[in-house]
Amino acid sequence: MHVVGSIIARLGSKRLPFKNLLPFAGKPLVGLGIEILRATRLVDEIVVSTESELIARVARDFGATVLRRPEALAQDNVPSVPVFQHIVENFPCDVHVNFNINLPLCEPAVVDRAVELAIEKEEALSVPYAAWAQTAHRLRNYGDPWAPEKKAFLFEDSRAGPLDVHTLEDLLEVYRAKQGRIEGW
């Protein structure tokens, strides 16, 4: 069973520019993510998908393989699934797990649990969203990535860490867009 762990890291984040290179716990966020994936039991290969040479250099320094993301997949409005499919096309595997480095306090055990559940159920997503694992078969047959089906097996794990990196402006934008549609807001 070959497991590819990935980090998708754009330099051009509009919400928090250079976010993936900013220091967290003394390391660039992308570097910390690579270290977390390296500490898992089940991830065999670590790939960072990016359009940025700066992020690519840091990723290589931390021992990850870099996959250049085409500009068409490096836009704000592109869902994650096409990016995952691009990774799997270039790095064949049985299971792909993406580590969302917006949640940098995630423990390696959460990533391993997502992989185990994906093997059992084809797709698993941690709550909070730190690890999203899918079998290669599931990714190849995902359907419309712009309107993904809600088939992922959701599992709560306090080791995912409640931290999510955003700006105040970003959070206010989400609040305005969802106002009246989210319970408790």
Outline where the language-model segments fall.
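Conserved core of the sugar-phosphate nucleotidyltransferase
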Residues: 77-86, 95, 100-185
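Short phosphate-binding loop-to-helix
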Residues: 47, 53-97, 105-110
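Short beta-strand/turn micro-motifs composed of small residues
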Residues: 9, 50-51, 100
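Short glycine-enriched, charge-decorated loop/helix-capping segments at active-site entrances
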Residues: 19-24, 72-73
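N-terminal nucleotide-binding beta1-loop-alpha1 segment
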Residues: 1-17
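Short beta-strand scaffold positions
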Residues: 49-50, 165
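A short, N-terminal amphipathic alpha-helix
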Residues: 29-46
